[in-house]
Amino acid sequence: MSDVDPQGPFAETDTRPVHDTTPVVPHDVADPWHEFEGWGLVAAQNDIVETPFRRFRRRFVRRRAALVALAFIILIVLVAIFAPLVAPYDPLEQDLRNTLQGPSGSHWLGTDELGRDVLSRMIFGARVSLLAAVQAVGIALVLGVPPGLIAGYFGGWVDTGVSRINDTVMSFPPLLLAIAIVGVFGPNLRNAMLAVGIIFAPRFLRLMRASVMAVKEETFIEASRSIGTPTGRILRTRVLPNATSPMVVQISLSLGFAMLAEASLSFLGLGVQPPEASWGAMVGRAYRFLDQSPTLVLFPGLAIVLAVLAFNVLGDGLRDSVGREVRGA
């Protein structure tokens, strides 16, 4: 037996206790990835996962026109909420000695045919117009989204039947259909917005149906079916959240068109009834005095144009920013 150390002169000295039998791992054959563990930790900390909401926010803030439109809409909402605090006069207070007056220091936007302050009536009219638009769009969502969800997911004869009914409703001229509905139920704001909601419902139905038909082919929907998830739960927690992105855009656009529809029906005397004020009703009553006081039509008409434009610009910004990126777990 040779006394020569087989590991040669470069062997490491084993200074462990005699009872320690753990094998010695030389430094030159230690874990080569140990020194990179810190790098991976730093990379994980610096790698910020961009959620769908963060991605949407990043895209939306780049669209200046949409931000301006959103700020204008928020301003209108705040004015409508705090109308009693903002309005300088009671919107129903009459002053028959100062009728059809132009803008002045005491009445910034003038007075109407009964001497009522136009600015105060516009401020309170903003509340009525906004609430009317929200009511109409809410009715459209309730009437349009559930049938579109069911038709798009199940297809077959269900889809065919729902689509035929939807096409029949869309075949009627919108204004004539609204006039007919208001004529049956009576001329007031609630019935007018019911009519507008019925008119808008087919658009929401078609959009939801198309979105659901695209979503139901995704792999996570197939996975939910394969593990036996109930259909109702799939529709509620998987399909609906992933099909609502286009609806956000449609809601914004429809709010603007609903305000315009309310103004049109009120102009015809089928919406807001005197003495309540809305922008459309103010234009309808002021039209008779166009030659005596042009500003009486100008200011509420301009408010309608700007509000509808703001909702449309906001809808365009949302359309460019939002994406169908929600997923079911």
Where are these regions (language model features)?
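Short hydrophobic alpha-helical segments within the ABC transporter permease transmembrane module
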Residues: 118-125, 130, 165, 172, ...
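Glycine-rich helix-loop "coupling/hinge" segments at transmembrane-helix boundaries
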Residues: 170, 181-185, 196, 211-212, ...
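Gly/Trp-centered helix-boundary motif
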Residues: 1-145, 149-150, 157, 175, ...
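Short alpha-helical transmembrane interface motifs in multi-pass membrane proteins
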Residues: 38-39, 128-132, 147, 159-163, ...
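Generic hydrophobic transmembrane alpha-helix motif, especially the helices
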Residues: 108, 112, 118, 139-143, ...
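Helix-loop junctions at the membrane-solvent interface of multi-pass transporters
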Residues: 82-86, 153-154, 180, 184-185, ...
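Hydrophobic aliphatic residues
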Residues: 76, 82, 100, 104, ...
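Membrane-embedded alpha-helical bundles that form the substrate/pore pathway
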Residues: 63-66, 128, 160, 167-174, ...
